[in-house]
């Protein structure tokens, strides 16, 4: 049998295959037949759209093919024929159909619309549905676009550790990694667990961010980025939080907060435009069935400049807007999703950088501003989501950094290597973190993070 042609190739290079005998392999999405002929919609995973296969009773196995259950896998040999009068641009007139694998008749994804809640219970099968085939194709293309954006600008891709002995965010919401017996762990004299007897000789956790390690490489290679899994033990059962997710974290040396925001804006626009160019069928599907204003919004983001406002100005806008919020607004609070969405969706009506946050609600490594109250930090807020990027200029002054750590009761011994970076040719540098899943939610219009992760990990859920 000849080598299979991808359905994607048939759609992208149709003229190369018209009126020729070809072979395709894929899974049956739909099948309808009569006594003399039938139609099969086949998808091979390479393209969002199916291809129609027409077969008739000249096939030796016509009756067997006519009764095949949905999701059975087949190979088809036939002629690709143009169908200008039909919905589809072409079809295959089958000469031979080979059954590769039969599906059971109780296959749960029949031809009807299923709720996302139900599809989460069959996460091992949901990539075969239209919505999730589109979602995970976009996820793949967006991941490639991120690498391409940074590689084209000579950034060094850096792999930071997943197991770490430090807490980058200082929040303490981390998953512990240990080989100690939980029933009978070795104890210190004060009765606490003696982690010196653990595998790594100290308390270790799954990383919440690769940023501190990334700074080491930025101060050697100038411009670097990380792209990998991170973990947060936050018991937040919301549509925006997951215990395991992916982060993109660039770090740039000889750069300040303004440079950081410029990089973030350029990267976001590049990735969105790349996905729009490479996944038009998928985005059209999302625009039709998930978020009817999606394409208009994405085009607006790509073509417009992002707004900028200080945290203090944002608080004043929220206090004067006359809108009743569930969470009161006052200077010093951490902005909630409802505040962020008001700013981006109702006031500015575009993506928005909020800068210069109070130091008390931000991490220890962010550069202290001259006012002594705020830090050179920024969050990028986008309509429909809220915060999607968090970044800052890093504190390069050793004495100021130590003072901040003392304020927050962080041990210098735990961060000795990070502090040492400030001794040997320190310079201003900056970076940000982008939650990859939130980016995919924004590009697709999907509203629940569980639906943009192949196998979501959330409180109480570790199935599959």
UniProtKB/Swiss-Prot annotation:
Top-rank taxon, per record: Bacteria
Record field: catalytic activity: tRNA(Asn) + L-asparagine + ATP = L-asparaginyl-tRNA(Asn) + AMP + diphosphate + H(+)
Gene Ontology CC: cytoplasm
Localization in the cell: Cytoplasm
Metal-binding keyword on record: no
GO molecular function: asparagine-tRNA ligase activity; ATP binding; catalytic activity, acting on a protein; nucleic acid binding; transferase activity
CDD domains for this protein: AsxRS_core, EcAsnRS_like_N
Signal peptide bounds: none
The enzyme's E.C. designation: 6.1.1.22
Any GO BP: asparaginyl-tRNA aminoacylation
Keywords, alphabetical: Aminoacyl-tRNA synthetase, ATP-binding, Cytoplasm, Ligase, Nucleotide-binding, Protein biosynthesis
Acetylation keyword on record: no
NCBIfam families (UniProt xref): asnS, PRK03932.1
Subunit structure: Homodimer.
Protein family (similarity comment): Belongs to the class-II aminoacyl-tRNA synthetase family.
Protein name as it appears in the record: Asparagine--tRNA ligase
Organism the protein comes from: Clostridium beijerinckii (strain ATCC 51743 / NCIMB 8052) (Clostridium acetobutylicum)
Gene it is expressed from: asnS
């Amino acid at each position: 049998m000849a080598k299979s042609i991808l359905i994607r190739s048939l759609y992208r290079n149709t003229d190369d295959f018209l009126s020729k005998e070809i072979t395709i392999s894929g899974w049956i999405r739909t099948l309808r037949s009569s006594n003399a002929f039938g139609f099969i919609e086949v998808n091979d995973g390479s393209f969002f759209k199916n291809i129609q296969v027409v077969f008739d009773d000249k096939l030796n196995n016509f009756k067997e093919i006519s009764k095949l259950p949905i999701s059975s896998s087949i190979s088809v040999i036939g002629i690709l024929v143009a169908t200008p009068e039909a919905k589809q641009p072409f079809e295959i007139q089958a000469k031979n159909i080979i059954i590769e694998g039969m599906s059971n008749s109780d296959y749960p994804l029949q031809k009807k619309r299923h709720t996302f809640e139900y599809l989460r219970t069959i996460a091992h099968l949901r990539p075969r549905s239209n919505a999730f085939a589109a979602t995970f194709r976009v996820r793949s293309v967006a991941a490639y676009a991120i690498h391409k954006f940074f590689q084209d600008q000579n950034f060094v891709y850096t792999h930071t550790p997943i197991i770490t002995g430090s807490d980058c965010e200082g929040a303490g919401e981390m998953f512990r990694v240990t080989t100690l017996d939980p029933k009978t762990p070795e104890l210190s004299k004060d009765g606490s667990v003696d982690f010196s007897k653990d595998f790594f000789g100290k308390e270790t956790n799954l990383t919440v961010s690769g940023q501190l390690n990334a700074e080491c490489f930025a101060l050697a290679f100038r411009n670097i980025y990380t792209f990998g899994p991170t973990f947060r033990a936050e018991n937040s059962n919301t549509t925006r939080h997951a215990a395991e997710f992916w982060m993109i974290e660039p770090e740039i040396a000889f750069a300040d907060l303004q440079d950081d925001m410029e990089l973030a804006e350029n990267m976001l626009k590049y990735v969105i435009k790349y996905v729009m160019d490479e996944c038009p069928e998928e985005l059209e599907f999302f625009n039709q069935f998930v978020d009817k204003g999606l394409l208009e919004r994405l085009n607006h983001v790509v073509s417009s400049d992002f707004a900028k406002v200080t945290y203090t100005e944002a608080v004043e806008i929220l206090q004067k807007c006359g809108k009743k919020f569930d969470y009161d607004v006052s200077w010093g609070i951490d902005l909630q999703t409802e505040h962020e969405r008001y700013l981006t969706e109702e006031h500015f009506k575009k993506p928005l950088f909020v800068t210069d946050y109070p130091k008390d609600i931000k991490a220890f490594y962010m550069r202290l501003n001259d006012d002594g109250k705020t830090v050179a930090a920024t969050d990028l807020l986008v309509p429909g989501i809220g915060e999607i990027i968090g970044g800052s200029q890093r504190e390069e002054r050793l004495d100021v950094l130590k003072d901040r750590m003392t304020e927050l009761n962080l041990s210098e011994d735990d961060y000795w290597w990070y502090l040492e970076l400030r001794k040997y040719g320190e310079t201003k540098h900056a970076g940000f973190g982008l939650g990859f899943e939130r980016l995919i939610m924004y590009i697709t219009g999907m509203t629940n993070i569980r639906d943009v992760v192949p196998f979501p990990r959330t409180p109480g859920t570790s199935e599959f």
